Amino acid sequence: VDTALKENETPYSYYTDELISQVTEALKEQLGYTDTQASNLLFSGGLQIYTPQDPQIQEIVDEEVNNPANYDAARYSVEYRLSLTHPDGETQHYSQETLKTWLQQVKGQSGFDGLFNSEEEAQTAIDEYRTALTQDGSTVLGESVTMILEPQTSFVLIEQSTGYVKAINGGRGQKTANRTLNRATDSLRQPGSTFKVISSFAPALDACGATLSTVYYDGPYSSGEKEFRNWWGSDYKGYHTIRDGITYSMNIVALRCMADTVTPQLGVEYAERLGITSLVSQDQTLSTALGGLTKGVSNLELTNAFAAIANGGTYTKPVFFTKILDRNGKILIDNEPETRQALKDSTAYLLTSAMQDVMQSNTMYTRSGSGVKSTGTTAAIPNMSCAGKSGTTTSNVDVWFVGFTPYYTAGIWGGCDNNQPLKGGTVSNGGTSYHKRIWRNIMTRVHESLSDPGFTVPDSIETADVCRKSGKLPVSGVCSSDPRGTA
């Protein structure tokens, strides 16, 4: 793509916003430019910037992210700022939080959750609030209102073999300005169970001698004063493998794997190997196995971590531009991809194999007889090999699905900007599965003309029959390594 950036009245796309940031940093780091020099060259220097963005894929992503039919409901949050001068000369400031409190306490809407059913309903509430605040003769110094369509979404699609970012979308709804919040690259959100793969199971397989058949006990589990449960409740299942832990997103299996085999320190180290840069020392805890992080992660970095798995364990820094030429056609920067081996190819394949099961119809039965199903079947795409992992945070504040095919890796985040829990039913603000449908719809369209080569099995993979209960090589007639004791 030959791009000459100019200031204009049409807001840049989310991709262009990130491209500007990436090019600016490259000009500063590689050529020694100041912020001002880089900006002047970028917008007025006649640069030719070549990007790997795929216009057709980008169009598909934008269409599906903004298609109302892909959402169970549409509601609106408000970013509100109001400054008043009271009759006594005092200046006071108000926000969406004070508006929410007023609606709950003064207007009797105790159940108001910060979301409105329409823009008109939101504006009516704002008008009433302003009127109530100015009844004493206070005057308005300034006011700003931004309506935000909820639930929000971000999407990232990467070609894992090259690191080329083919498309991103930083939020649904009309983009009204340049360099606004880009939920795909700027927002740090809790990753939930997607992080089990990165911080617990990947290092266990890669560095600690575990296999997909290594077993951990799914039962009551606590650390310090914190008690952990599985996402389906307190109905435990006994001994289960790492493969089961991934397929059914078993919290206790992931926690015991980190505690007994990996250690939180190694878990954080592996997440950083896979390109997660937002971790801090306080994240060296067991909660990291479940994605309970201090700051959270960006969609771009989380998706790219899975792209490394899809690429046989080779991490490639995300590429938004391939080269920059000056106005005379001279190459200023040739952006060669930065790569490193983050995982063994055997580890990457084992994780891929287990995450294929996530997207297939599998059911595991609890001791009470109730069924727990694999968590990614809604996202499965027809006639194409795919592997992935879902993630949901406490109270359904964030929902994720990150997965890949032999061609592309894609990640979707869903949630409300104001951290309102996602709900279904009669008070729906989006539900907790819409993101998987969007992921499936986008990836189905992207792969329509592509054949399915399957996932390549590396030469380093060896197969063997193992005891299902112990994860060890079986003994003919009896499994003497069964953790419950010999038969």
Q: What role is predicted for each listed range?
A:
Residues 1-96, 272, 277-278, 287-291:
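Non-catalytic, structured segments within soluble enzyme domains
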Residues 5-9, 209-267, 327-357:
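Conserved catalytic neighborhood of penicillin-recognizing serine enzymes
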Residues 28, 34-43, 225, 244, ...:
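Substrate-binding clefts and substrate-entry loops adjacent to catalytic sites
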Residues 28-41, 165-179, 268-282, 381-384, ...:
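Active-site-adjacent bridging/hinge elements
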Residues 51-74, 78-89, 93-147, 151-159, ...:
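A penicillin-recognizing enzyme superfamily signal
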Residues 148, 153-159, 165, 197-201, ...:
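C-terminal substrate/ligand-recognition segments
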Residues 182-212, 217-220:
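Active-site rim segments in enzyme catalytic domains, especially the processed small/beta chain
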Residues 227-231, 261-304:
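Mid-domain, small-residue-enriched loop/turn segments at the edges of structured enzyme/sensor domains
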